[in-house]
């Protein structure tokens, strides 16, 4: 099915949830909510506050697509974010005194206690957390009392308060207890957590006043999808009741419904119901939104419940179509011109993802009878699905949408559509078409490294070398994928910033409650929870303090925090961003498998950030995130007769099997690193299918940019850029690997079975 998958069936890297947004500009905030950032080991997870705006929040306030719940270990892939490094002057290594972190030490959470290990109380903490997730109030109450001296005692205390408040939301005593808790922990992340979950309880109880009071005080979580939907619902209810600002409230609600990545969330379902109650005539636009969001069951339910007068099509005919669109088309294919235009619009939207060619035939038939806006909406969707299927007709379909491509009323995914229009143009090899597509991008996307680079390439190919060089130069100081390619386009060396890492001020961070609570969570393998505390400590720090905290993370072997914390600065400290833990083991395994160690380092950095015990929700394990089934297959191939799944978290075993599998994948794709890297992430059969879709030999950079899975696209770009950095930064003979060389050219080859798991 041609869709941009967020879940990859073979071996997702810590549960892959992709963001349907393109790369942001060099130091714009990554497109992550704080919840997403917390749930992420590998992606840049913090907005960079400029040093002069010390209080900049982590979230940029935008409603995000596919927001992630704050519970559970998940992996989120944001856009590739490039860095404009600060000019570097050689400095002497010295201990840096960080600025005061925005945390409040409390008597209940002595920082040093975080490093104290007590297996019995740790086990009780985990069990209490599980009880909280199951809403077992009695077990949580008991756990909270017993864990009063645990380093993370404030969490069971909060869980207990939340369960009691959920049970009796109007109980004044429970409300006062929660208010007191929040006041006592003012300035700590736990207060943000308490306000967020209390706001959700208030929304569930339709307590608008309480919700707004809590929502206004949130620093991080205002952009969570359910809270955004609840706020829009309460604002709409006020407008309906007071008869004031109703058009504005309806417009805001429509925008939220259009942009939310969680239309199934209960809060967003309630908003949709409130919106339709306030404006029954909006039923048809909302129906079309649901069709584009592929919420076909919800669309069918809406059609069933809506007054027939609000739909421009017979509801029985609509039900027949939605129940079995393929059967419907076979019955009506020869008389499409006699079917109502609205019904054909729905038919094309319904079939676009599963049968794009048939959808295009229907769109062609009905186009003359549609308004310009509806015609644009339809062809935008057909073009998008064709582009995601790597169909060579995609660019022509997009062109049929006209000037309103991606922007017609009720069109879902404007930025996504416009970005894929540009990617479809890349696959045509028509550089004038590429330039035209890039020029249609919104300013923020146009300023991203990716589209600065491709615009420069287009200008270069169409006879404007001076303008092209100016654009290349504007990103050539960046250290990510397109910054490296821009350097090559200019014939200049890659950036080589040798700023030394600071000596960590351990005594300072040892007393920082948020940092120490994070360490306690990491000890319990509760990485998402630990990341929230870590990021909270980090959120207002300036560059030097962030680098010092990164050094502290490295000294604790928290390489995922060392990398991410250092990346949340404009100062490029290569030893922090590209560490080499387990050097002997990694290099031995790579060399035994006849792989370049730099590639293995680059892959592990993206897979697990060198977390030895990393485990995905579907079972991928260890630094190289190997699935047990794959591991058993490779072990049999290597005649490792004594292998067991439990060995996958053993560093040596994981590296041996992971490297051998990577070598087998590379050999299956004739040594092509883009194809092999994509295959390691998304599966060999998918990589082979993407290659088969090519109509001519394509440069590796174009192939990588047009991979239809957001996660895999970013993965390939990051892994290969990582490979260049590891090869360049640590290579004593300065024999620099060129990114363009390892990207190479990808040649089409008929689809074939790849005998690999």
List each language-model region with its residue ranges.
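Alpha-helical adaptor scaffolds
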Residues: 161-166, 182-183, 195-204, 216, ...
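Residue-level signature for tetratricopeptide repeat
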Residues: 130, 159, 163, 201, ...
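Gram-negative bacterial Sec-dependent N-terminal signal peptides
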Residues: 2-27
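Alpha-helical repeat scaffolds
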Residues: 139-143, 171-184, 208-218, 242-258, ...
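Generic helix N-cap/helix-start motif at coil->alpha-helix transitions
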Residues: 116-124, 136, 149-157, 172-174, ...
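Structural motif corresponding to the intra-repeat A-B loop/turn of tetratricopeptide repeats
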Residues: 134, 167, 201, 205, ...
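Catalytic glycan-binding domains that act on GlcNAc-containing polysaccharides
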Residues: 150, 158, 361, 365-375, ...
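Compositionally biased, proline/threonine/alanine/serine-rich low-complexity intrinsically disordered stretches
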Residues: 28-117, 121, 749-757
